[in-house]
Design a protein with these regions (language model features):
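Hydrophobic alpha-helical transmembrane segments
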Residues: 52-57, 99, 138-143
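Transmembrane alpha-helical segments
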Residues: 30-38, 81-89, 116-123, 147, ...
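Membrane-interface alpha helices of multi-pass inner-membrane proteins
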Residues: 63-66, 84-85, 95-114, 245
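Perimembrane helix-loop-helix junctions
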Residues: 114-146
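Intrinsically disordered, low-complexity, Ser/Thr/Glu/Asp/Lys/Arg-enriched terminal regions and linkers
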Residues: 40, 88-89, 107-108, 141
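Membrane-interface transmembrane helices that cradle and orient dolichyl/undecaprenyl
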Residues: 42, 48, 83-96, 126-129
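Membrane-interfacial catalytic/cofactor-binding modules of polytopic membrane enzymes
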Residues: 1, 5-23, 61-72, 76-81, ...
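Transmembrane-helix signature of polytopic, membrane-embedded enzymes
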Residues: 2-9, 29, 34-62, 239
Length: 245
């Protein structure tokens, strides 16, 4: 239970203004530049007017304005960093893009939604580049990614190496069960008709089974897309004999 009338925290006009200003500030620092770069990069063949219309449409996205900004989730920062990664990938700056995506993952674990596609794209590019160039590119990406994660987790590691487990548990909150944070949409929706926890057993082994099952089905769902991306890298390589080295 919770105290409905006394657990709301500070709700002064000044605190609300401060929180809203932080959202606007982070949007101006991360999200808006990412959108501007996106329209200029991905819509470069189109007219300037079309680019401006696309930018305005993206800036007025109702989901961010009405929901995320309303309760200060700062999802625009995560989305902005992911979009910056895609922008840099599109311009051939894969290493900078990898750093941006690591920052996105570090900011909010929801960026894991995009990890299979981004990882598959980069691996497909390494395949396309050929054994020698592709392996060198893969190595550079690996070093940059590991170094970026190491710097992110360093503040947790320095006081005590055991502290590093806490952010990892927050990124992968399996210990909280399948219905953590209402992000398991299929399971929450289907639970109206099929009581999954009752079916699996409302105990530790039952919760563990649900987590393993959902993870396996999630992987099964995105594996076809991963294979398509990897195959595209291989077929493009076969069509380009100049990348055989």
């Amino acid at each position: 239970w919770f105290a409905l009338d006394t657990s709301t925290g500070i709700e002064t006009a000044g605190s609300k203004l401060y929180m809203r200003l932080t959202v606007v500030s982070f949007d101006l620092l991360v999200y808006v530049p990412a959108l501007i770069m996106f329209t200029k990069t991905w819509l470069s063949p189109r007219s300037k007017r079309t680019q401006e219309q696309a930018l305005l449409l993206l800036l007025l996205q109702p989901a961010l304005l009405l929901i995320d900004h309303g309760h200060f989730q700062y999802n625009s920062v995560m989305l902005g960093l992911t979009l910056l990664a895609l922008d840099f990938f599109a311009t051939g700056q894969d290493l900078i893009g990898a750093v941006c995506f690591v920052l996105s993952l570090g900011f909010k674990q929801m960026a894991l939604y995009y990890a299979p596609a981004i990882g598959s794209y980069l691996l497909a590019k390494c395949i396309y580049l050929g054994p020698r160039t592709g392996l060198a590119h893969f190595t550079r990406l690996g070093v940059v990614t590991i170094a970026s994660f190491a710097l992110l987790f360093l503040p947790f590691y320095i006081p005590s190496p055991s502290h590093i487990i806490h952010p990892i548990q927050r990124i992968f909150p399996f210990s909280r069960g399948l219905f953590e944070d209402k992000v398991a949409n299929f399971w929450c929706a289907s639970n109206v008709l099929i009581k999954w926890r009752k079916l699996a057993g409302d105990n530790e082994s039952g919760r563990s089974w649900l987590v393993r099952t959902s993870a396996a089905l999630t992987a099964l769902g995105f594996i076809p897309s991963v294979l398509v991306l990897l195959r595209s890298g291989w077929t493009m390589r076969l069509r380009t004999p100049s990348h055989s080295t």
